Swiss-Prot record:
UniProt record, GO biological process: capsule polysaccharide biosynthetic process; galactose metabolic process; UDP-L-arabinose biosynthetic process
Record's subcellular location: Golgi apparatus, Golgi stack membrane
NCBIfam families: galE
Membrane disposition: Single-pass type II membrane protein
Protein's name in the database: Putative UDP-arabinose 4-epimerase 4
Catalytic residues (UniProt): Y244 (proton acceptor)
Species this chain originates from: Arabidopsis thaliana
Stretches that traverse the bilayer: 61-81
Keyword Translocase in annotation: no
Residues in the Cytoplasmic compartment per record: 1-60
UniProt main location, coarse: Golgi
Lumenal compartment segments: 82-436
Length: 436
């Protein structure tokens, strides 16, 4: 057959081709020059797909579709596509409190009380001194959505602090986060100025930027130093004698200076020596093992009673007191937390309240040890050593002002009873929250 160009076409019979050891039939159409029959001018293979190739294409399409669906799911669950959480928006009738240091001894007890009183609580803690076990206990007690959230963060990180405040709608801040050992502060003063003074400044700045209007600041009687006159009132001159007290006073000064031109409601609570634990047995004091030497006298008594240490070391027997040992005002943690909640309830815009939180009664270290022996039922061995640097002889409060203004008074004032409550938790949790 000829066409106008003098080229003829010829259809050849299908020929087998081998691909990977398999033969398939591929019909082929060739074009010849009729002047030169042996010359192939062109060829066109006809469409033909191996069944396995079709299956591979289908599989790829399904894979692409699956990945597309997965991407849609991930995007839809991202923060920009989900509805705001309860913590990120204000709700009428609900007060959202940021509790810094809320995994610590006092902070966790405060969080428990706030949650029990139907506050919404966000705990921020870097766990350098706090216990994740305390947070888990609170989460188990209050599992409902929108009640409690925990954020692992360091207040010394300004980006983290800004993120926390920008993503949450706080109504108030209870600022407990700090390092709080007098002896340690004399060894590592810069750590104390950073963690107490500098971090408080960061929190205060974030509150100002995000218009959080209430601050309850956890301060200390250590800001008074060693006053010449007892008891200590809120007007007693503040002359701290160790870096812990100095760092706290500097933080107080910053807050007071800021409040002069702010509508923020501020409460500063200067409290004394904290003991005890939750009467319900849910929380307790559990310092890290490496910090036990720096810890409170109650912790040392309990360690001695359990045989974790050979005995109790009392540092200083030559103070100008009745028995030569330091005199302190021991406040039960349950009473202390109650004072914080009352301060939160009574805080007023453009006003500052400063209060001592104590029982108004001083007890010597020797008295404390005897009470601890009775509470534990163990005859604790006591070694008397030289004074600890930075300590002071006698400190106890005059709680008249807090009674008058906030209608607060200490209820758990029996030293032995408070120690018995704490001892019950210690016996069940000999290794702290790791005992679960």
């Amino acid at each position: 057959m000829l066409n106008s160009s003098g080229v003829r076409t010829q259809r050849r019979s299908p020929r087998p081709l081998s691909l990977g050891g398999r033969k398939i039939i591929t019909p082929t159409k060739f074009a010849y020059d009729h002047h030169n029959p042996d010359k192939v001018l062109d060829f066109v293979e006809m469409d033909c797909l191996e069944p396995k190739t079709k299956n591979n294409l289908t599989g790829k399409l399904l894979l692409v579709a699956s990945l597309l669906i997965l991407a849609i799911i991930v995007i839809s669950q991202s923060s920009s596509f989900t509805s705001p959480s309860a913590f990120s928006q204000r709700e009428e009738g609900v007060t959202h409190v940021l509790v810094t240091g809320g995994a610590g001894y006092i902070g966790s007890h405060a969080a428990l009380r706030l949650l029990r009183d139907s506050y919404r609580v966000t705990i921020v803690d870097n766990l350098s001194r706090g216990n994740l076990g305390a947070v888990k206990t609170l989460q188990q007690l209050f599992p409902q959505t929108g009640r409690l959230q925990f954020i692992y963060a360091d207040l010394g990180d300004p980006l983290a602090v800004e993120k926390i405040f920008s993503e949450n709608a706080f109504d108030a801040v209870m600022h407990f986060a700090a390092v709080a050992y007098v002896g340690e502060s004399t060894l590592y003063p810069l750590k104390y100025y950073h963690n107490i003074t500098s971090n408080t400044l960061g929190v205060l700045e974030a509150m100002a930027r995000h218009k959080v209007k209430k601050l309850i600041y956890s301060s200390t009687c250590a800001t008074y130093g060693e006053p010449e006159k007892m008891p200590i009132t809120e007007d007693t001159p503040q002359v701290p004698i160790n870096p812990y007290g100095k760092a706290k006073k500097m933080a107080e000064d910053m807050i007071l200076d800021f409040s002069k031109n702010s509508d923020m409601a501020v409460m500063i609570l200067r409290y004394f020596n904290v003991i005890g634990s939750d009467p319900g047995g849910r929380l307790g004091e559990a310092p890290r093992p490496e910090l036990r030497e720096q810890g409170r006298i109650s912790g040392a008594c309990f360690d001695a009673a359990r045989g974790f240490i050979p005995g109790l070391q009392v540092k200083g027997t030559d103070y100008k007191t009745s028995d030569g040992t330091c005199i302190r005002d021991y406040i039960d943690v349950t009473d202390l937390v109650d004072a914080h909640v009352k301060a939160l309830e009574k805080a007023q815009p453009r006003k500052v309240g400063i209060y001592n939180v104590g029982t108004g009664k001083g007890r010597s270290v020797k008295e404390f040890v005897e009470a601890c022996k009775k509470a534990t039922g163990v005859e604790i061995k006591v070694d008397f050593l030289p004074r600890r640097p930075g300590d002071y002889a006698e400190v106890y409060s005059d709680p008249t002002k807090i009674l008058k203004d906030l209608n607060w008074t200490a209820r758990f004032t029996n030293l032995q009873d408070s120690l018995q409550v704490a001892w019950r938790w210690q016996k069940i949790h000999p290794h702290g929250y790791n005992s679960y």
